[in-house]
Amino acid sequence: MRVGVVTVGEDSAQEVCDRLVQGGVEAIWSFAPGRVELPQGVMLKHAVIAGLVSQGADAADMGFCGYSAFEHGIRAFGYRGGMYIRMGDDAHSGEIVLCDGTGTELTGSCFRAFQQELKTGAVRPITTERLGIVQRVSGAAKSYDAHLNRLAQSVRSGPNGVTVLIGGNPETYDAVARVLLPCGYSVRYYTGLDSDKLFETAKEENTDLAFMADGMEGVMCAIAYGKHITRHELNAVLAMAAVKDGRANKLVLPADIPGEYVKQIADEGAEISVCPAKRSRWARAAIEAGAYLPELFEPEAKIIRAAELYLAGKLKEYLDGLPKVTINEKKVPCSWRDMGRVLRSFTEGERNEQIQLVDGVKVNVDKGWVLVRPDSGFTAYRVIAGSFDAEYSKELTDVYAGKLRAIAEDKEG
């Protein structure tokens, strides 16, 4: 979970560090800060390490690495938690992500508990406690490369004719290139930030696959066969391939993935459960269920597996085999104070046998489904509807958006 924006200069790094340590050292004993490169980030990292050590916590400096490598390192090296520092583009601000021992962000009640202790927790006296130990861990990136190489099934060979264009996070590009280039793929980096221009560039350069990746949130845009591939389509294809290859027989999927895709994957023999769609909660649920599939969560693994499916001729086969579901979405403004009342009234108005309460409220109807959930800023409700019938999908969106709007406007309800 993002603790907030840290601006080096307004608060000293040591003061930021002290406040973080006061709240977190009890819960996070063996701690691994990682991923900084700008001078301000390096200063903040060393201040955090100094504060942790002064409070008796052991700290492992994982150096500079991508977010997926950081998550993998937390799990592989057995740390109790971690802190990922990413500096902003302006070099004066950045964000800190706190992770637990599963390598996933602290969210919800876990974050609120940390935040509360951060504000009120006592500093343990250093005179009565041991000083922590600082360890330099230099193998995080190489360990993650080995993980990706095990995931890849291609053998080292000459050029295979497949060109992959990757934009966005440079660490994602570097990790993917280190795996795919020796296997004969052509891997290029796109320096722009606009997904639409990525599509144009991929078309102009006759690129087979193109991706816009964020190192923390995953693949934001995927292009193959001259068209955009939605994140749900890509996730469904990768999950289907893993089941058919015998790499997975149990999966955890996000609640907002179309039910038609879930049914098709389940028909292949997979045991499937659903969970909230937020990446950190989804990843944690998959890890706890023993159903973690790297390509569903790690952008590097996602790109590598998609490239290999393309090379094998299976990507198009799986994409063409997906049910043709049309998804529409609308937003209904709603005050955060009214969120609970509106959702409760909405749920009470639907038949019990039609609803699923996983990530908001999902209503299953005869020819489709509707998912109602708050947006990330808790300023509106998202109404997402899906159906084989495009017109019916739009109609569902309009009808349920109207229901929510009426409830939100009825202050007496």
Language-model regions, residue ranges each:
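Ser/Thr/Gly-rich flexible loops in soluble cytosolic domains mediating phosphotransfer, phosphorylation
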Residues: 34-49, 53-54, 101-136, 140, ...
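Phosphate-bearing ligand-interacting subdomains
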Residues: 1-46
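Gly/Ser/Thr-enriched, mixed-charge loops and adjacent short helices
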Residues: 94-207
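Phosphate-binding and adjacent anionic-ligand microenvironments
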Residues: 208, 225, 245-413
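N-terminal small/polar loop signature for handling phosphorylated ligands or for N-terminal nucleophile
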Residues: 48-94, 178-224
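Glycine-rich phosphate-binding loop
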Residues: 7-8, 12-13, 27, 80-93, ...
